[in-house]
Amino acid sequence: MASLSLGNLPVNDPAYVRKVVRTVVRALDNVIDLNFYPVPYAKITNHTYRSIGLGVSGYHHMLAKNKIKWQSEEHLAFVDKLFEQINYAAIEASSDYAKEKGSYRYFEGSDWESGAYFEKRGYCSDEWKELREKVHRQGMRNAYLLAIAPTSSTSIIAGTTAGIDPVMNKYFLEEKKGSMLPRVAPDLSPETYWYYINAHHIDQNWSVRACGVRQRHVDQAQSMNFYITNDYTMRQVLNLYLKAWECGVKTVYYVLSLIHI
C-alpha cells in the first residue's frame, strides 16, 4: 500500500496528479515481484491477482488549504471530482503496464474485460468510454487498485493529517509507542483555522456521505472512523451504520468516543 499526501499535492493540477498516480502504481506493482513472502500462499495470491492499494492521507489538510468546509456540499463535489481523477489515472496506468508486462492471470472474463466495472459506477462520459475500450484491448496489470489506509503514523512523518479522517483538534497530544507527541493541524493559519473543525464536533452524517461519494471510485475499502460523544444514543450510532450501508460504504474502522467534561 502507498498513500498520496493530498495536503502536499497540487490537487487542482490534474496533469500533476496523473503523473504522480502513474508513478505510484508502477512502484506498487514492482513491490509484488520484489517482496519477500514468508507464506507461500500469499505469494501465489499476490502473483495471481497483483492487487495493490493506492490510498490517500492529508485529506482534512487538503480541504483546509483549499478553504473547503467539511460540512458542505462543496466538500462532496470536490472529492467526487478528485477521486474520479485519481481512479481514472490508476486504471489508465495499470492498463498501460499490462500492455508492457502482461495482464493479471484472471483478467479474461473479469468485470474489467466485460466493462461491467465501468457500468456499475456510472462511468459513461466519452473519456471513460475511451478508457474502457483501452482496458478491453490492453488488459489490466492489477485486479484491484485503490484502498485507503489509516496512515496515523506515516502522516506524522509527512507533516499532514491522517488518512481521510478529520483532525482530533487543532492542537493535541497523541500517544505513540509510549511517548506523547504534540500534533498541530498542518498549515494552521488565520486563513485555515476556521476549516479545521474538531473531529468530535462534526456531524458524522457528513463524514458518511463523503465516504459514500469516495467509495464509488475506490474498488476496495476505506479506513473510516466515527467520532461520537457520550451524548450519542445507541439508536444514533446504529443510524450511522445504516447510513453508511445506504451510501455504499464497505467498512467502518473504529467508533471513537469522547466524554464531555
State each model region's role.
Residues 1-46, 56-66, 160-161, 167-191:
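Function-dense linear segments that define catalytic or interfacial modules
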Residues 3, 14, 25, 56, ...:
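Alpha-helix initiation and N-capping motif
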Residues 20, 51-55, 86:
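Short, contiguous, pocket-lining structural segments
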Residues 21-43, 69-151, 240:
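Internal maturation/activation junctions in enzymes
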Residues 28-33, 117, 121, 134-141, ...:
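Catalytic alpha/beta core of large soluble enzyme barrels
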Residues 43-49, 76-84, 225-233:
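Conserved short loop/turn motifs at secondary-structure junctions
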Residues 51-69, 236-249:
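Hydrophobic/aromatic-rich, well-ordered segments within soluble, folded domains that form packed cores
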